[in-house]
Structures are given as structure tokens and as C-alpha cells.
């Protein structure tokens, strides 16, 4: 498991960047580089359920480990969800990475926002994450600065 970090400075206040990150419409825009048609469904509760899903309804089962809007959110990934809605949090494949974190930290940077993202991941996904976050953060910047 490795930790990858990404950062961008956005000429917008933290709340605006937060809203672009997690608004249903804009979330799909910046996450399209991971998988077109991505959605996030969450009860927004620490210890509750959050799902990161592709256009077919399959994806990751996660929970919110820490939530301090608009400063930070930390997701802990627990398992997989297939397109039929079956959760897998127990298989050997899932247990190899279950418990890894994905962190979004928004720092006030003189009226701008420094968005810092950290994601724990298997080495085999590094190129996919680098491509997705590099392009995705640019979309977040564009949306937050122009909405």
C-alpha cells in the first residue's frame, strides 16, 4: 500500500471548493477521469455508509472517518459493491486493501484554497490515480473559480 498526494491552489473560498467537490452534478464532472458517470451516495454521517459508484452501479463501499466541513473529510474504504447491490467486505481480495483512506483537506491560503488530497492505494492503481486526480483537480479549480 502506498500513499499518493495531490495539491492545487484554487482562487475561491473553501466552502465553494467543498461544494464543487461534493455537489451531485459537479462530482460527476471532476471524477469522470476515473470512470465516466461516477456518483457518490452518502448519508454524510461519521461511521455511516458512503458509496462511490460507476455508471453501472458497482463500486466501493466506504465510511466517513472524519468530517469537518469545509475543512476536511476522510473516507475509509471498506469493500466493493457489485452492480446488483451485493457488498463484499470479507473476501481475501478486499481484505488486502480494506481500511485504506482517502483524505480531502481544504486550507485557507490567503483568501484562496489549497486543496490537498491523499489516497492510499495499491501500486498497480498509481497511474490511474495520478491521471484521474491530475485532471480532476483542474476541473475542480475551473468550476470553483467560474461558478
Question: Which residues does each PLM region occupy?
Answer:
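Hydrophobic ligand-binding cavity/cleft-lining segments
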Residues: 1-38
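A short, structured loop/turn motif at beta-sheet edges
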Residues: 10-15, 65-73, 105-114, 142-146
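Hydrophobic pocket/interface hotspot
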Residues: 17-21, 27, 50, 64, ...
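Short beta->alpha connector loops
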Residues: 32-33, 55-58, 122
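Structured surface interface patches that mediate subunit assembly and partner/cofactor docking
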Residues: 33-36, 120-121, 135-147
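Glycine-rich portal/gate segments that line the openings of hydrophobic small-molecule binding cavities
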Residues: 38-88
Amino acid at each position: 500500500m502506498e500513499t499518493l498526494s495531490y495539491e492545487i491552489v484554487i482562487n475561491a473560498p473553501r466552502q465553494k471548493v467543498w461544494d464543487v467537490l461534493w455537489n451531485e452534478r459537479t462530482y460527476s464532472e471532476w471524477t469522470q477521469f476515473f470512470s465516466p458517470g461516477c456518483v457518490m451516495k452518502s448519508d454524510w454521517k461519521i461511521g455511516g455508509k458512503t458509496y462511490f459508484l460507476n455508471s453501472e452501479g458497482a463500486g466501493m463501499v466506504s465510511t466517513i472517518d472524519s468530517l469537518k466541513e469545509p475543512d476536511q473529510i476522510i473516507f475509509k474504504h471498506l469493500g466493493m459493491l457489485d452492480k446488483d447491490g451485493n457488498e463484499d467486505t470479507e473476501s481475501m481480495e478486499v481484505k488486502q486493501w480494506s481500511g485504506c483512506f482517502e483524505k480531502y483537506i481544504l486550507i485557507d491560503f490567503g483568501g484562496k484554497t489549497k486543496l490537498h488530497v491523499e489516497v492510499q492505494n495499491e501500486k498497480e492503481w498509481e497511474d490511474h490515480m495520478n491521471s484521474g486526480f491530475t485532471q480532476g483537480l483542474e476541473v475542480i479549480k475551473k468550476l470553483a473559480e467560474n461558478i
